[in-house]
Amino acid sequence: GARGYDPGSTNRHAGGNGGDSSISGPGITAIGGGGGATEHSENNPEPAGSGGSGGGASGSRSNSNGSVHGTGTPGQGHDGGTSGSHWYMGGGGGAGAVGGSGNSSGHGGDGLEDDILGTSYWWAGGGGSNTHHPAYYNGDKIRGGKGGGGAGAPCHSGHGGVSIPGPDANGITTAGAPTSQTSQWNWHSGGSGGKHTGGGGGGGDYHGNGITHGRGGLGGSGIVAIKF
């Protein structure tokens, strides 16, 4: 799906849902994951998408719970995380676990481990969320889920320094890293999902900056493996 971005309060774009993949003979369809929500406290918010796994809920600028998270599909993935009480977003759902709640940790949900290729890898981890305060970012609180999930973007340095989690390396490829922390409050983009992992992209800055900065990460491409 398309990356989410925020060029202004009247023209927000949530992350797009991933595309479905199918095998026509046995009639098997893997449903694409749901995109993450935009911020919802001002004009024209867009909610999280539902799919194979659900997108994470947005945070609220006021001291109240945020928007509804996306839901996953039983047998394929899990729900996105719920948002917290103040600027804290939920992580994207993974194939093996729900996304983290913004009240405590908006990390991406972990995927599933499988050795169909002869080596054990994790697949389809959810993307981590962004947050507006370092207390809810440091360590693995905004990490991408195991299976190529991209980590969420850091907050600006005016709120304090953060320890950016390393890109997830449990998949067949390593997820992309989010933008390094700067003093800009609308600059940071989330890390992209790992190629061929089916991992979700991490959330971008709470306040976006057009179509170039402050964007959600790209979702990782998937893979079809048939063993016989």
Model-assigned labels for residue ranges:
Residues 1-228:
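Low-complexity, glycine/proline-biased repetitive segments and flexible coils/loops
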